[in-house]
């Protein structure tokens, strides 16, 4: 998890078509460890139990469909601590790399998920050092299982209105947004569709500090015409961003499992 002040980024949740195909991809190509499968969910972590988290939810074609036009998710950037693990991933499954880069610490690569999502895997402190290379000179490590840790470092979202999209997250987190979110202006029929209809990014889940006042945040959002839901225990605040991506925020004392693929949350109410 990535933390900034009062907030931690817990996990993204992606709706997918074929769960097993995606499990194979995240395990073999990205080196994630499958932590558990529960109903339609598959939950991934790292191989040293450092609290890395990444979640997918299977939605079959009779309930969901492919995105028409650009997806809400443009790019996912994932950082690992050990540059050698990037080499081991490339040695194990290099045909999945659509582009290979060389940086100050080592290699990086871009790959495409089964749902046609662009993912960059790297171990750099400065992405500007990455230069495209034709191939990676790597050797396979026989006992390599997967990455020892990973962080969802940044997301790029395709949005209808970049100013409104940025305002939502600025208003919600201020300067404490615990990951980088970039916005690309795009046009398409599914950029604001309900998250249960397409195979796309569905949820961005956050945790708040133990002493953080979710009630005050809920009241602030309501005054600013953003509809949100606060549960009776005052430990879960749920709302959606301008792209209808669900953004649940939970307190640490709330011990219930915190994945919401089947629960409806209020849609955003744009400011006038």
Which role fits each region the language model picked out?
Residues 1-20, 76, 128-166, 201-204, ...:
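N-terminal beta-strand motif that seeds the catalytic metal site of vicinal oxygen chelate
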Residues 8-16, 64-91, 94-149, 151-160, 178-182, 222-272, ...:
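Vicinal oxygen chelate
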């Amino acid at each position: 998890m990535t933390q900034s002040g009062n907030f931690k980024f817990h996990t993204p949740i992606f709706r997918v078509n074929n769960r097993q195909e995606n499990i194979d991809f995240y395990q073999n190509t990205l080196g994630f460890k499958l932590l558990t499968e529960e109903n339609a969910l598959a939950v991934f972590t790292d191989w040293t139990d450092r609290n890395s988290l990444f979640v997918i939810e299977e939605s079959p074609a009779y309930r969901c469909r492919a995105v028409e036009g650009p997806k809400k998710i443009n790019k996912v950037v994932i950082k690992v601590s050990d540059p050698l693990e990037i080499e081991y991933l490339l040695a194990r499954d290099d045909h999945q790399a659509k582009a290979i880069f060389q940086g100050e610490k080592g290699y990086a690569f871009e790959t495409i998920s089964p749902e046609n999502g662009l993912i960059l895997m790297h171990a750099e402190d400065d992405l500007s050092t990455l230069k495209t290379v034709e191939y990676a000179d790597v050797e396979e490590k026989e006992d390599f299982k997967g990455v020892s840790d990973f962080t969802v470092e940044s997301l790029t979202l395709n949005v209808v209105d970049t100013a409104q999209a940025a305002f939502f997250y600025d208003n919600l987190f201020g300067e404490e947004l615990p990951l980088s979110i970039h916005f690309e202006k795009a046009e398409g029929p599914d950029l604001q569709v309900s998250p249960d209809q397409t195979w796309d990014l569905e949820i961005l889940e956050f945790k708040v500090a133990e002493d953080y006042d979710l009630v005050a945040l809920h009241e602030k959002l309501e005054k600013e015409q953003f509809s949100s839901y606060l549960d009776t225990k005052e430990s879960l605040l749920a709302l959606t961003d301008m792209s209808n991506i669900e953004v649940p925020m939970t307190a640490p004392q709330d011990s219930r499992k915190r994945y919401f693929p089947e629960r409806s949350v209020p849609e955003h109410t744009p400011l006038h």
